[in-house]
Every structure is written in C-alpha cells, then in structure tokens.
C-alpha cells in the first residue's frame, strides 16, 4: 500500500483538487457543494473519502491532490480515531501546507473540549492548521468553503510566488498554548 504523495503527479493547468476525508459524511457533501458553487478564478475538483488509504483502483486516473482536509466531528470519538489512523497513509511531503483539519461541534459540551485539545495536539505535531466550522447553517458551511478555497489556492501554487505553501503553513499552523504544551510534553 503506497503512501499518498502530493508530488507524484503533474498538476493540471488552472485546476486544483481537494480531498475531503470524513468518516461520518455529515458535513462532507454540504462542504463539497459549497466549494464547487463558490465563484473562483480556477477549476476545483472535489474528491470525497471516508478514510485513507484511497483504493488502488483508478489510481492512474486520479488527479493530483493539492489539499487534504480531515473533517473531525468533536461529538464522535470515531471521527477523531479515523483521522488519526489516516495520517499514517500520507507521505511526509503532504505536511508542508497540503493538510488541514476542519473541526465541527466545538461548542458542544466537555467531551468536545477534550477532543478539541486532542485535535490541536495532533495538528501541532504535524504542523497543520485547524479550522473550526459551523456546519449547521448555510452561512457557516459557506464560510468554511471560502477558507478552504483560499488555502487550496495557495497549496496548489496558484498565488504569487511570495506566498508559498510553506509560508501559508507558518501563518496557519496550530501553535500550542502554554497549557497545551505542558500537557503535550507529559
């Protein structure tokens, strides 16, 4: 089983591909539709997966994936576990501005706060950004889609040379606060 690598295929002209990975598919379809419907200056392919690794079938026909988004529902432990297990199927080059975590239900109770801390630690250990999204309203889904499109544009190399994926990574990385660092080091 090969690792998913961001540079194994040649990019298509004026086209970017985002892979949305969500175990429960609660937000995945809404977000995919919002991304496709947003007005943009480039073509966007949206691919959906429940988990990684991707199936070997149609590997040659699959486009280059410019951004991988792990959608984690904080109400579900299984959602977090699926994202954690999927990370092992990514090549290390993916973690330079090509992966992010999108979390939902961050305001729902104490269990979600514990899982949010776990996601933030996971993201910080891989130098990936964490985006919180409201998936219960159309405006929340639209705002999340717009943020992902901005990140996708940079990760696909469709912005001026001064803004690279590495630069984006330094701007959006999940930094640990001092109390999280203490927990992380223990």
Curated annotation (Swiss-Prot):
Q: Which UniProt keywords apply?
A: Centromere, Chromosome, Nucleus
KW Nucleus (keyword) present: yes
Q: Which residues form a coiled coil?
A: none
Q: Where does it reside?
A: Nucleus; Chromosome, Centromere
Top-level taxon of origin? Eukaryota
- Which GO cellular component terms, listed alphabetically, does the Swiss-Prot or TrEMBL entry include? chromosome, centromeric region; nucleus
What the entry lists under Gene3D superfamilies is as follows: P-loop containing nucleotide triphosphate hydrolases
Q: What does this protein do?
A: Probable component of a centromeric complex involved in assembly of kinetochore proteins, mitotic progression and chromosome segregation.
- This one is known as Centromere protein M
